[in-house]
Each structure stands twice: as structure tokens, then as C-alpha cells.
């Protein structure tokens, strides 16, 4: 079984890990409801692309 000849330094390890990051979610302003919501999803008030397609979620 292969074994590393040298220990990986902190700098080398951190340079490799620079691409391991979480992308911020895409948020858009919905002019119909006046709220911010995620793209391609129904808003909490039941609107999608400016049209009402579902009942609003109730706060139980």
C-alpha cells in the first residue's frame, strides 16, 4: 500500500481546500408580494412568476 513520503504542510492543505466553500443562495425580489424569495420556488404567499398558484402557508 502506498504511503506519502512527506507530511502535507498546512499551506498546501489550505490551498487545496480553498475551493471547498458553500455558495450563497440566489435570492430575488418578488414585486407581486414585496418579499425576497429563492429563484424557481413558490413564495410563502403562494406566488410563482407573479401568479397565485397555491394557498398561503398558515402559521400554526
Swiss-Prot record:
SUPFAM superfamilies: Zn-binding ribosomal proteins. It comes from Streptococcus suis (strain 05ZYH33). One of its GO terms (cellular component) is large ribosomal subunit. The gene is rpmF. The keyword Ribosomal protein applies. Belongs to the bacterial ribosomal protein bL32 family. GO terms for biological process: translation. Pfam families: Ribosomal_L32p. PANTHER family: 50S RIBOSOMAL PROTEIN L32 (PTHR35534), LARGE RIBOSOMAL SUBUNIT PROTEIN BL32 (PTHR35534:SF1). One of its GO terms (molecular function) is structural constituent of ribosome. InterPro entries: Ribosomal_bL32, Ribosomal_bL32_bact, Ribosomal_zn-bd. This is Large ribosomal subunit protein bL32.
